């Protein structure tokens, strides 16, 4: 991941990947162990997160996925239910098909398998949903999408530490997360909250990307 990110400019990127074989994770708050499940056929799951919106997280997600896809089998899942960006970033305006087992088939472009709530919300209507419904939709994207064999699944999370993020870290066996921020003090405070959330459930933060540094 570190080498792929360097292809997008001269910058100092420090990323350390830690591999954990234990799926039962003890949270930092002393809670009961969490049984986090892998996605069948997916080797590594990387969450791209931010504490604040508008920091370029979705742009970094698709560029990182595209760079990895040159040598690896890669999927990209846009989990921002309220404001999905992947349809516009990928230039896709169609709905995914379903298998005979009623699983969604990811759309393919740029040698990547792509899935977003924006692909199935044909009317582009705003999602006015409460937390429990959002959590169920998030879980469906893990269980009811036919990802096939992947080396990496990149997750583009919505900003903050809300229901989607909590559902994710509690139920999914993440390889790690990458935090995206900007130099402003408010953004840095929020990204620290996000990093603390991952730390409490022993999900390693692989790196922090400071975006828009020269603006």
What is each of the regions a protein language model found here?
Residues 151-152, 158-215:
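Conserved catalytic-core segment of NTP-binding enzymes
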Residues 13, 73-74, 205-206:
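Hydrophobic anchor at the start of a short beta-strand
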Residues 44-78:
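Walker A/P-loop phosphate-binding motif and the immediately C-terminal alpha-helix
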Residues 42, 53, 78, 86, ...:
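Residue-level signature of catalytic and energy-coupling elements of molecular machines
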Residues 54-63, 84-87, 160-165, 188-190:
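Short glycine/serine/threonine-rich phosphate/pyrophosphate-binding segments
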Residues 2-49:
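Extreme N-terminal, non-catalytic leader segments
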Residues 121-168:
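Phosphate-binding/switch loop-helix module in NTP-utilizing enzymes
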Residues 71-129, 135-136:
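Phosphate-binding loop that captures ATP/GTP phosphates
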